[in-house]
Amino acid sequence: LAGIEMGFVELVKLLFGDAGTGKSSSIKGILNQYYDQGLRIIEAYKHQFQDLNEVIAQIKNRNYRFIIYMDDLSFEEFEIEYKYLKAVIEGGLEKKPDNVLIYATSNRRNLVRERAADKLEIADEDDLHSSDTVQEKLSLVYRFGVRIYFGKPDKKQFQEIVRTLAARYGVTMPEDELLLKANQWELSHGGLTGRAAQQFIDYIVGTEEEKRK
């Protein structure tokens, strides 16, 4: 994800993987790191995709660097907004602006939900060209020049995240007790993820503050 200060060479990036693994947090971290150097983020939602070219036209000559950011991006079978996004990424005859980059995060590797019939490429009376349909849907993800996978940590890595966060927030609980409670916490809070670790530490910090009152 680094390299922004060197220029926007890789214009389109997709961060995909399991929920709670830090995709959105990474984007926020980039903004915090480079804000003073002129980085700004514009968050776009699916219903706004048809207006993205107009947005880019308005910001391409400004003295800032912009990330157009789409969080938790995915499309259902009936949605067509992905076609607008493909058109934006591909661009027209004009040169793509050097100060605009597109980032998206998603829990889906292919962004667009596939039907079982799509995967099997089974044609029926309603879709005589199912193979073409499959390729059209899957082609969106290939427009992202850089695709970065975020996987869940294993138990050892999860515990290391908990230790690191505990030290950062000044948690005083003994380590054995801390890790035992963390293991119990993740069972009912989404499993072994960075998000679960952060939520657990937030809970512990709040509990310790209450005890000190």
Predicted regions and their residues:
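Conserved P-loop NTPase "ATPase switch" module shared by AAA+ and STAND
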Residues: 43-46, 62-81, 85, 108
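C-terminal alpha-helical "lid" subdomain
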Residues: 151-213
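Conserved nucleotide-binding/hydrolysis micro-motifs of P-loop NTPases
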Residues: 47-50, 73-76, 102, 106-112, ...
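Pre-Walker A (pre-P-loop) alpha-helix and adjacent loop at the N terminus of AAA/AAA+ ATPase modules
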Residues: 1-12
